[in-house]
């Protein structure tokens, strides 16, 4: 496709974030404004990331998007909301007299290709990374340098938290137009270098009820959710921020587990009830509490989003022993060498005392694999043209 003007192509990556004070429920469905503030940990992109390439050209006849190699409907309302918002900000920037770094017409159509290096829609916060990456990449294409919380949030609420590294707060805000519902960093990724994150992948299948439908039903039917948002979350946000600033793992871990349990309690309080946890999820919860009881302190902490996969926080000196405990209780059926992905973990032998305390009959194959990772940075621009997911013709490159 010979183009009269050079095509503008930008590729970026964005991280997954895991909430330790959960967001569940919107007060405005269209603007995606939450009923409570939330706080999350950004995971490292070496293990989990979305990569997005956006290109604009006068030769494109329509906006198009490909996710993990498959073309999707660009008419999806949330995709449209993101695009509209970015183009509005670009027009505003231009009308404010800023010099346009890329002399291009806002009427040009955009092609977007995006891929995750982890299962989509399996409770690994893929939409958060995806929409954060989309917002960040489109902003680079259109020369927008303002806060992108609103753009990302219009795609997926928790996406605004993936715009920053480290520890991130999404302030619920009070304004009806949502201008004060923004994400901000509580502490950078360098703040707590010993913190480690283990993702226990129970299922890579799509969940039975998506988050959007689930939280809408909860807002309509759960009195517990309303009480949580109004009375319990504000002091929890302050306490969680303090735990992080002081690097107090015991308090951080306990509050993380309590908040996860309370979130799932609001799901059960929803009518009809929603259950995102599986039998394996509940066994992991039991394993964590027995492991901590054996040590007489909180050394590991679980949290579950709207899905059965566990995210476990711990410190680097505990990772090896806890991974061994998981292997003992949930032995891999066959793929022993592929059971652990991500950061290397030295194998260790469990003490007989700990095995006795765990006291669970092993359930082979119920955990598919573990991803070992750590706290990481926010979105990144990839300067290497070889990283582009779109070819010179503006279409996805063939899979290597």
Swiss-Prot record:
GO biological process: cholesterol biosynthetic process; isopentenyl diphosphate biosynthetic process, mevalonate pathway; isoprenoid biosynthetic process; positive regulation of cell population proliferation
Transmembrane segments: none
List of residues binding (R)-5-diphosphomevalonate: 23-26, 78, 156-161, 212
Entries under Pfam families matching the protein: MDD_C, MVD-like_N
Molecular-function annotations in GO: ATP binding; diphosphomevalonate decarboxylase activity; Hsp70 protein binding; protein homodimerization activity
Gene Ontology terms: cellular component: cytosol
Chief location category: cytoplasm
Enzyme class: lyase
Reaction catalysis annotation: (R)-5-diphosphomevalonate + ATP = isopentenyl diphosphate + ADP + phosphate + CO2
Location of N-acetylalanine modifications: 2
Pathway: Steroid biosynthesis; cholesterol biosynthesis
Keywords: Acetylation, ATP-binding, Cholesterol biosynthesis, Cholesterol metabolism, Cytoplasm, Lipid biosynthesis, Lipid metabolism, Lyase, Nucleotide-binding, Steroid biosynthesis, Steroid metabolism, Sterol biosynthesis, Sterol metabolism
Superkingdom per UniProt: Eukaryota
Entry EC number(s): 4.1.1.33
InterPro entries per record: GHMP_kinase_C_sf, Mev_decarb, Mev_diP_decarb, MVD-like_N, Mvd1_C, Ribosomal_Su5_D2-typ_SF, Ribsml_uS5_D2-typ_fold_subgr
UniProt-annotated location(s): Cytoplasm
Physiological role: Catalyzes the ATP dependent decarboxylation of (R)-5-diphosphomevalonate to form isopentenyl diphosphate (IPP). Functions in the mevalonate (MVA) pathway leading to isopentenyl diphosphate (IPP), a key precursor for the biosynthesis of isoprenoids and sterol synthesis.
Family of the protein in this entry: Belongs to the diphosphomevalonate decarboxylase family.
Oligomeric form and interacting partners: Homodimer.
Protein name: Diphosphomevalonate decarboxylase
Protein's organism: Bos taurus (Bovine)
């Amino acid at each position: 496709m010979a183009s009269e003007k050079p095509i503008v192509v930008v590729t970026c990556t964005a991280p997954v974030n895991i909430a330790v004070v959960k967001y569940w429920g919107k007060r405005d469905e269209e603007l995606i404004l939450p009923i409570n503030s939330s706080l999350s940990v950004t995971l490292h992109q070496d293990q989990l990331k979305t990569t997005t390439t956006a290109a604009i050209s006068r030769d494109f006849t329509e906006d198009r998007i490909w996710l993990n190699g498959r073309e999707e409907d660009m008419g999806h309302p949330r995709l449209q909301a993101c695009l509209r918002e970015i183009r509005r900000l670009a027009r505003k920037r231009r009308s404010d007299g800023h010099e346009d770094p890329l002399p291009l017409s806002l009427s040009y159509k955009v092609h977007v290709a995006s891929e995750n290096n982890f299962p989509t829609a399996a409770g690994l916060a893929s939409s958060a990374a995806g929409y954060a990456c989309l917002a960040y990449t489109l902003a680079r294409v259109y020369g927008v340098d303002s806060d992108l919380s609103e753009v990302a949030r219009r795609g997926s609420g928790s996406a605004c938290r993936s715009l920053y590294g480290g520890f991130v707060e999404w302030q619920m805000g009070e304004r009806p137009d949502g201008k004060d519902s923004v994400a901000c960093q509580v502490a950078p990724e360098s703040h707590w270098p010993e913190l480690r994150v283990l993702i226990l992948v129970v299922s890579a299948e799509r969940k039975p009820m998506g988050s959007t439908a689930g939280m809408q039903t909860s807002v309509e039917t759960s009195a517990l959710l309303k009480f949580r948002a109004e009375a319990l979350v504000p002091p929890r946000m302050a306490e969680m921020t303090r735990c992080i600033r002081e690097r107090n793992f015991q308090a951080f871990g306990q509050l993380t587990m309590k908040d996860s349990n309370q979130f799932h309690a609001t799901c059960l309080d929803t009518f009809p009830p929603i259950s995102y946890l599986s039998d394996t999820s509940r066994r992991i919860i039991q394993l964590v509490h027995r492991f901590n009881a054996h040590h007489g302190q909180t050394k590991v902490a679980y949290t579950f989003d709207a899905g059965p996969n566990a995210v476990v926080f711990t410190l680097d000196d505990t990772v090896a022993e806890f991974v061994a405990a998981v292997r003992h209780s949930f032995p891999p059926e066959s793929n022993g060498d592929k059971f652990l992905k991500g950061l290397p973990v030295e194998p260790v032998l469990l003490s007989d005392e700990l095995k006795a305390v765990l006291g669970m009959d092993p359930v082979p194959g119920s955990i598919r694999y573990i991803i070992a990772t750590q706290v990481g940075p926010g979105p990144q621009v990839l300067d290497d043209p070889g990283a582009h997911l779109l070819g010179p013709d503006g279409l996805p490159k063939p899979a290597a």
